[in-house]
């Protein structure tokens, strides 16, 4: 007789190999065809809301690995909250206006298109790009309202953004002014703080002499009767700002020195610098010198000095006053700072505080980076080309003390990677220190208070955002571009004042934009709204910063506080969002702009929590770079290993720091995935012939080890759910993997195989095991689902067609309409866990001894062994209570417990009996049944008799 055919060997349609890259697209298609996202919404109706508001990626170019990390993290959170019993809609969005798309249109169609054509082509380009990205995001297994995303260029969003502008204008935050703003010559526009990045750059660092003019006043400041000729000396890394110098700054409390130097420079024998910098500066200049007098910076206030280029050209025949400034330091330079108010924020503030009028500020640099043609010596030159010529002119004028090349960290445009300058231009701002109409906190105060009320993941994000808000300048709202939401103001042609009905007029414009898009503003004849006043006003041509676009989506998409605006998705979403989740660069980007708009509109942040993830680096910690050749594209991983592997990599990596990825790292992830899949396959295969409704054993009647397995599973589920709740995914993955490999694979399932395979198919013992296994399988598959979405859905389908075939059709459609599995509560759960925890420890000791004996060649498998255990006290009672079931726990052919005082002792010997051909146990009764001499008495009973009885295991 072929006894193998009498075993209940596991069988399942769930394949051992995932073949993920081939199978996953089929699941994506099924989810779309079955309208799974809509099914989740229907199943979740009435539950508490959880809103993760999607930070919109820019609709330009294919997604990269950073996008994949971001969307996968969001998907894990949304799915885990949904399965935890929340209604967690996910509306993806795209950022559609702005420079990069405008540049692409210019590249394709040229620079001189009419605005209407720019808009039409930009819209078409954005739609084409976001559709490519949408397909890639879907391929990652991300579920969401993909057919109805929010787009910042949707007419309703553009209209509501104009309404947001109207509200913050009405509250008094918006003003126009001349201020130095970040300016990119390639963009031809102001930049937001978030659009500036830092990179090393080499520039000439120069020490420049400003000759004495009023020597009598200078002598008085130092308590001298008179002084010789000389100069005050500054240090700068921006020679191009020297033609625009209008002041000098010293620190009021720093001690300054008059130093007689030799050999004598062109300007005379004296130099004026900070006393603490004398030694270092003289060494740099190659001069000898002695201090003849000192005075605090306070005493120098108001003294004037000649422009260093005065000898080079008449146009520089002017003087520069000293202003006191607390920001002057002694780290480098001379302790004296040159001030060009058009090109530095502190310079601007200092000069304005000392009465310099906007009209008197010298700003010879045009928007393209060239000096105006009338600037003496350097007119028409680009400032970067002018740098060496300015150095040469200073040298010829006798004003150059020293020059050297300096590599330093400098501002660059994040799009063009070209250097950025501060440039004073007339712009529209949101004032950080403006008190709103009706009183209350300033925007800065409100934002800082809002940060305190926000939960940060990880916690260090709070200090980072606080520092940025505390120190940031006013927000430059305006941009000089075409493809953007208009700052739809009517400005008086003579006075520059806004029309007195601006708030009302903005609403009229918004209504038109709602119907026709921002194009409505371009085609609007002012007479339609202003009537006879139209001749006195002109349309403002500025557009809004794209960070205002995305930063106001909490209002334009979610609908704002108390649905103050309708919001494109306001009916299914809520304000404030529970969570914003983006990369760490968004502390200065979307987190930042959203905080400011939320506080301007409603006095609070639009989010309850902020989650930050790090950037992706290679296995050696290097940034992804095409030139280095270490770029890993998510599309390639999906097409080779499967998106599931990317999802598992994201979840198993600590996202709070840098996320390392390489072929070797992904290989390890694949191995981890296989272990989980193999566990899942074993579980599914052993409940394939089980009807979870009609064949289940009541929970109170389960064998003790099965009850313990459910207690163990409940503990694991509680831990994993807690990790999901706090967004700690890598410990969740680790716990799931440990559960599969140690709790199940190395313990429970290992013990269970004998009972599952050898007991009668419908026996109580086997059905007890299957009852527990079905609960464990459902628990595991549901806990895996937020991370391993494709695999969980595949397993759920197998379960739905077998052990769960009597479930309702809605539940069988997808696992994602489910909530986490409810396991039976056991009153004696702690006692069970304690007993079996100790049994597992003893079992581990026995397994180690068995390995030693196997190593000596005395036994093959553990079933060839017989074990004697000597114990007393609680251990004796614990082991004795198992009776004959102890051998199944230890997976040996005989296990005998003996009472003996002292430490627990284990003895192992090879069995002298024959091996049963069916169960492979070595038993004394093998051969005693004449009809079936090859098998043991237990197998005879299980096959032809009443079957064995099991109580514990």
Swiss-Prot record:
Question: What cofactor(s) does the depicted protein rely on?
Answer: Zn(2+)
Enzyme Commission code(s) on record: 6.1.1.5
Entry's cofactor comment: Binds 1 zinc ion per subunit.
Q: Which reaction does it catalyse?
A: tRNA(Ile) + L-isoleucine + ATP = L-isoleucyl-tRNA(Ile) + AMP + diphosphate
- Mention one GO biological process in which this protein takes part, according to its record: isoleucyl-tRNA aminoacylation
**Molecular function GO terms recorded:** aminoacyl-tRNA deacylase activity; ATP binding; isoleucine-tRNA ligase activity; tRNA binding; zinc ion binding
UniProt keywords (A-Z) are: Aminoacyl-tRNA synthetase, ATP-binding, Cytoplasm, Ligase, Metal-binding, Nucleotide-binding, Protein biosynthesis, Zinc
Q: Which Pfam families match?
A: Anticodon_1, tRNA-synt_1, zf-FPG_IleRS
Q: What class of enzyme is it?
A: ligase
User: Annotated motif 'HIGH' region: location in the chain?
Assistant: 57-67
Family, per the entry?
A: Belongs to the class-I aminoacyl-tRNA synthetase family. IleS type 1 subfamily.
Listed PANTHER family: ISOLEUCINE--TRNA LIGASE, MITOCHONDRIAL, SOLEUCYL-TRNA SYNTHETASE
The name this protein carries in UniProt is: Isoleucine--tRNA ligase
Query: Which species does the entry assign this protein to?
Result: Bordetella avium (strain 197N)
């Amino acid at each position: 007789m072929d006894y193998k055919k009498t075993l209940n060997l596991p069988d399942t349609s769930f394949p051992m190999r995932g073949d993920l890259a081939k199978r996953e697209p089929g699941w994506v298609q099924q989810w779309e065809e079955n309208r799974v996202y809509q099914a989740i919404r229907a199943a979740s109706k009435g539950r508490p809301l959880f809103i993760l508001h999607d930070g919109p990626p820019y609709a330009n170019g294919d997604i990269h690995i950073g996008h994949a990390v971001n969307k996968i993290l969001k998907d894990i959170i949304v799915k885990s909250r949904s399965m935890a019993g929340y209604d967690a809609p996910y509306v993806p969005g795209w950022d559609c206006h702005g420079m990069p798309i405008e540049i692409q249109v210019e590249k394709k169609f040229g620079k001189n298109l009419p605005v209407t054509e720019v808009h039409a082509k930009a819209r078409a380009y954005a739609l084409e790009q976001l559709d490519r990205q949408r397909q890639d995001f879907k391929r990652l297994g991300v579920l969401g309202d993909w057919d109805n995303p929010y787009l910042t260029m949707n007419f309703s969003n553009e209209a509501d953004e104009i309404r947001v502008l109207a509200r913050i204008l009405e509250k008094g935050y918006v003003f126009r002014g001349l201020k130095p703003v970040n300016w990119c010559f390639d963009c031809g526009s102001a930049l937001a703080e978030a659009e500036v990045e830092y990179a090393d750059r080499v520039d000439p660092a120069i020490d420049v002499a400003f000759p004495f003019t009023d020597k009598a006043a200078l002598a008085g400041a130092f308590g001298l009767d008179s002084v010789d000729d000389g100069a005050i000396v500054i240090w700068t890394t921006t020679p191009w700002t020297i033609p625009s110098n209008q002041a000098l700054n010293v620190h009021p409390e720093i001690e300054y020195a008059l130093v007689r130097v030799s050999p004598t420079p062109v300007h005379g024998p004296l130099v004026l610098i900070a006393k603490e910098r004398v030694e270092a500066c003289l060494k740099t200049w190659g001069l000898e010198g002695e201090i003849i007098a000192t005075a605090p910076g306070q005493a120098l206030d108001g003294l004037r000095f000649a422009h260093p280029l005065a000898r080079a050209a008449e146009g520089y025949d002017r003087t520069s006053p000293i202003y006191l400034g607390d920001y002057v330091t002694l780290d480098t330079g001379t302790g004296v700072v040159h001030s060009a108010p058009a090109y530095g924020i502190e310079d601007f503030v200092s000069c304005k505080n000392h009465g310099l009028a906007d009209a008197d500020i010298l700003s010879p640099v045009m928007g393209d980076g060239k000096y105006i043609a009338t600037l003496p010596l350097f007119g028409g030159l680009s400032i970067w080309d002018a740098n060496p010529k300015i150095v040469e002119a200073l040298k010829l004028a006798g004003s150059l003390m020293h020059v050297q090349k300096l590599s330093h960290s400098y501002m660059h445009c994040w799009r063009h990677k070209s250097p950025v300058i501060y440039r004073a231009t007339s712009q529209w701002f949101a004032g950080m220190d403006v008190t709103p109409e009706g009183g209350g906190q300033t925007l800065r105060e409100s934002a800082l208070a809002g940060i305190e009320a926000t939960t940060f993941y990880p916690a260090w994000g709070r200090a980072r955002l606080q520092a940025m808000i505390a120190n940031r300048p006013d927000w430059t709202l305006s941009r000089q571009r075409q493809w953007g939401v208009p700052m739809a103001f009517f400005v008086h042609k003579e006075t520059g004042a806004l029309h007195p009905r601006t708030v009302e007029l903005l609403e009229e414009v918004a209504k038109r934009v709602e119907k026709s898009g921002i194009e409505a503003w371009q085609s609007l004849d002012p007479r339609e709204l202003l009537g006879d006043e139209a001749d006195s006003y002109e349309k403002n041509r500025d557009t809004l910063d794209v960070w205002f676009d995305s930063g106001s989506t909490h209002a334009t998409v979610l609908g704002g506080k108390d649905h103050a605006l309708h919001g494109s998705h306001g009916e299914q979403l809520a304000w404030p969002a529970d969570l914003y989740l983006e990369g760490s660069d968004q502390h200065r980007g979307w987190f930042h702009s959203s905080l400011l708009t939320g506080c301007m509109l409603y006095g609070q942040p639009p989010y309850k929590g902020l989650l930050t993830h790090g950037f992706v680096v290679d296995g050696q910690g290097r940034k992804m770079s095409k030139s280095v050749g270490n770029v890993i594209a998510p599309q390639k991983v999906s097409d080779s290993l499967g998106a599931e592997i990317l999802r598992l990599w994201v979840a198993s990596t600590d996202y709070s720091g840098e996320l390392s990825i390489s072929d070797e790292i992904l290989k390890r992830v694949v191995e981890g995935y296989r272990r989980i899949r193999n566990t899942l396959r074993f579980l599914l295969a052993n409940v394939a012939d089980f009807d979870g409704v009609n064949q289940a054993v009541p929970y109170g009647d389960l064998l003790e080890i099965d009850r313990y397995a459910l207690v163990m599973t409940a503990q694991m589920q509680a831990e994993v759910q807690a990790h999901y709740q706090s967004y700690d995914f890598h410990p969740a993955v680790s716990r799931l993997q440990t559960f599969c490999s140690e709790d199940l694979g190395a313990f429970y399932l290992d013990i269970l195989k004998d009972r599952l395979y050898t007991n009668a198919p419908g026996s109580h013992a086997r059905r007890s095991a299957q009852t527990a296994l079905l609960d464990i399988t459902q628990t595991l598959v549901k806990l895996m689902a937020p991370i391993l979405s494709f695999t969980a859905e595949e397993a759920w389908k197998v379960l739905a067609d077998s052990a769960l075939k009597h479930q309702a059709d809605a539940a069988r459609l997808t696992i994602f309409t489910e909530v986490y599995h409810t396991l039976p509560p056991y009153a004696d759960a702690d006692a069970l866990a304690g007993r079996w925890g100790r049994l597992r420890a003893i079992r581990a000791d026995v397994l180690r001894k068995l390995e030693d004996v196997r190593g000596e060649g005395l036994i093959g498998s553990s079933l060839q062994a017989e074990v004697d255990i000597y114990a007393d006290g609680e251990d004796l009672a614990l082991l004795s209570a198992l009776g004959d079931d102890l051998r199944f726990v230890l997976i040996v052919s005989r296990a005998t417990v003996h009472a003996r005082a002292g430490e627990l002792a284990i003895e192992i010997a090879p069995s002298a009996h024959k091996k049963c051909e069916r169960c492979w146990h070595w038993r004394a009764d093998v051969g005693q049944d004449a009809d079936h001499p090859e098998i043991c008495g237990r197998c005879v009973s299980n096959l032809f008799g009443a079957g064995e009885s099991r109580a514990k295991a």
